[in-house]
């Protein structure tokens, strides 16, 4: 298994798919990395030469991934909460942030439904 950005990527998959195991690298970013490194998308990870692995590592190091990216996202959310913006308030209350309705749905954000005593007829 090749190790890129602190993540073991699978050997038997194509490189373009294996790179998506790194947090912050999706399919389009993976394709851009391979194009910049001059490596075919169809090659398997186990068939990569050490030089090709190093080229991929150099390209990935230029992108914010894994811990740095997670930290930045968390700091952005924390900043929104501190300045008291609408989005920050929604984060603090555990409600949907992007304008979704909450009358009937939003169970994922709100958690399990809590029964109200004395509601039966």
UniProtKB/Swiss-Prot annotation:
Subunit and interaction comment: Part of the 30S ribosomal subunit. Forms a loose heterodimer with protein S19. Forms two bridges to the 50S subunit in the 70S ribosome.
Highest classification ranks of the organism: Bacteria, Bacillati, Bacillota, Bacilli, Lactobacillales
UniProt keyword annotations, A-Z: Ribonucleoprotein, Ribosomal protein, RNA-binding, rRNA-binding, tRNA-binding
Pfam families assigned to the protein according to its UniProt record, in alphabetical order: Ribosomal_S13
PANTHER family reported for this sequence: 30S RIBOSOMAL PROTEIN S13/40S RIBOSOMAL PROTEIN S18, SMALL RIBOSOMAL SUBUNIT PROTEIN US13M
Location of the region described as Disordered in the Swiss-Prot/TrEMBL record: 96-121
Any one biological process term the GO annotation gives: translation
GO molecular function: rRNA binding; structural constituent of ribosome; tRNA binding
Protein name: Small ribosomal subunit protein uS13
Biased composition range(s): Basic residues: 106-121
HAMAP family the UniProt entry points to: Ribosomal_uS13
Family: Belongs to the universal ribosomal protein uS13 family.
Ribonucleoprotein is among the record's keywords: yes
Record function comment: Located at the top of the head of the 30S subunit, it contacts several helices of the 16S rRNA. In the 70S ribosome it contacts the 23S rRNA (bridge B1a) and protein L5 of the 50S subunit (bridge B1b), connecting the 2 subunits; these bridges are implicated in subunit movement. Contacts the tRNAs in the A and P-sites.
Recorded GO CC terms: cytosol; small ribosomal subunit
InterPro entries given in the database record: Rbsml_uS13_C, Ribosomal_uS13, Ribosomal_uS13-like_H2TH, Ribosomal_uS13_bac-type, Ribosomal_uS13_CS
Residues that span the membrane, as ranges: none
PROSITE patterns: RIBOSOMAL_S13_1, RIBOSOMAL_S13_2
